Amino acid sequence: MTIGESKTRIGEFFTDGGLGRHETFAPRYGWLKKGIDAVAKDPNIFKEDDAIVKLGVGKNMVRSIRSWCLAFKLITQGEDGFVPSMLGRKLLADDQGWDPYLEDDASLWLLHWQLFVPPFEAVSWPLAFNYCNLLNFNSNELKNIIYDAGQAYPSLARISPRTYQRDATCIISMYYDQEKKDSAITSPFVQLGLIHSSEDKSRVTFNIGFKYTLPPLIFAAACFSYIGHYLSKSRRTISLQQLIFGVNSPGIAYKLPETVAGQYLN
């Protein structure tokens, strides 16, 4: 598969992507564990009238939990409803899970990468990380960038600018806690430091540089995942440039410059 063919394949994944399904909520502490546990007990929990009681959240939050569990590839559609995915079981299961309560930053880095793995339940995330090259930006400017990028795909071009605006606002709030809110309503992904405040406090910037909490093994896993999803199985080699600058590459997802990525691979 050539680079051009790879881009075509990625474009097809973008075309099938979803927008605005998070109901304006970034993932909160405990939500993913709550969602996968509920699905393990009842595959149709998200359709149940008493889901708000069982999950202990509002109706819109029920839909948001469902969307984030799908976006992070923690649940998958089964014959009779949703079931925990292999990743969901291995990461969050009570008995054998690697990190059931997401206490290790490595787990958050692994989950963040899932947003760049098809299918895209939250397609604005890869659009933002791939196409926002501004030194700093606000939510309206980020909305314009992902909206313009979405116009290349007919299914995304039909989505209203208002939905893109909600996605842009959610992206920033997921990785940057401007108001220093209570931890119960803060996104755990703030810990990754992918978005920082700029000198102008009303604007933010992507943190492009070394990520002190990103384990080399997680970066390596993302590289293998990228190769598996986006490159031909006949390819025996891949350039460092493609791993860093290719659409939906680990370098793009983790905002790593080439020199830093080389250090991780060494």
Question: Model-flagged regions — what are they?
Answer:
Residues 2-4, 8-266:
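Donor-sugar nucleotide-binding helix/loop cap in glycosyltransferases
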